[in-house]
């Protein structure tokens, strides 16, 4: 039997291990998924800011179809925890592309590659000269959440007034959005060539209510708190995540009941973390843990009582789905992509955005409710956001572009059943 033709995929990313953001996790998991399919060779171009990974997430395995090329990078001025390509990285990427001869190029984080980064779109010229697809993925609602950062207003205003986003994305054949909310954000920026494909997902097998055990929380809870109701936020501690809103809502909640604790699991820019700690210092039972990864993260998720995410600008909501798969009720805000799949009173709870009192009231309602049916529905619904399904959706689309498959599947949205 004739072996299948191997197609080479080139992924140009700024988020990749050892960075521990949700985007980095997905880029890593996606690269491995495609490399294991037997019909792709995967080449990832990622920042070189820390070559030796500090967690198992970044450890290479024996996957011969996965190649990781590191390009020269620097901290991105608007958000220095993110690393972006230096100007000279574009030439290195061009030479490597000529060597690997990809059949398709995918660039994520387009704005970060261009603005205050390489000042160009690496791979575009190669794609044009060799007549191959040049695809973008819209992972981060950068323009909306930049409103949360006082120092970013110039970037947001400049991008809108100059129509920079529309100009950049017109250089690309198609922009893939994971949700209708992300697609709408693109359209508001003048990005017309979009397609909605639910490509993001989690490893649902990692998360389970069977992990629930209060011992996993003993590191942070004192003896008086061990029987408390524990609220959890897990993710990046950035202004755009509106953790300040949650801290204020928790203070209001404690006026109604004192038997509750708040765990804030994550990290972020020093100035943001310090500001949040100052906000919380007079409120009892608030605990900052730093980033949690792997088994520890999954165990803590299942062992808390309510997951709270007040972020209004999610293009997917990775930690929300992880919490759903862990068997704890989710409270989030009625905004962004999360409200496309999390339905009030069906598989979770929605609070009004930017409303401290409203968020506190919803959390209080959850603590008073029997959430068994909601948790069961959330567990079922989380399965539709598996990593396998998301990557398969992408693979189906790639195969259309590569001419492998003539079958056209409806990947534009997930049905609400």
Model-found features: residue ranges?
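N-terminal subdomain of nucleotide-sugar transferases
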Residues: 1-57, 64-70, 410, 415-417
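Conserved donor-binding/catalytic core segment of Leloir-type glycosyltransferases
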Residues: 12, 218-250
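A short helix/loop element that forms part of the nucleotide-sugar donor recognition site in Leloir-type
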Residues: 92, 208-224, 400-403, 407
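Donor nucleotide-sugar binding/catalytic pocket of nucleotide-sugar-dependent glycosyltransferases
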Residues: 157-216, 226
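Nucleotide-activated donor-binding/catalytic signature segment of Leloir-type glycosyltransferases, i.e.
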Residues: 274-292
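Aromatic "clamp/platform" in nucleotide-sugar-dependent glycosyltransferases that forms part
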Residues: 312
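Short hydrophobic beta-strand element within catalytic cores of glycosyltransferases
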Residues: 329-332
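Conserved acidic donor-binding segment of nucleotide-sugar-dependent glycosyltransferases
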Residues: 344-345, 349-356, 364-370
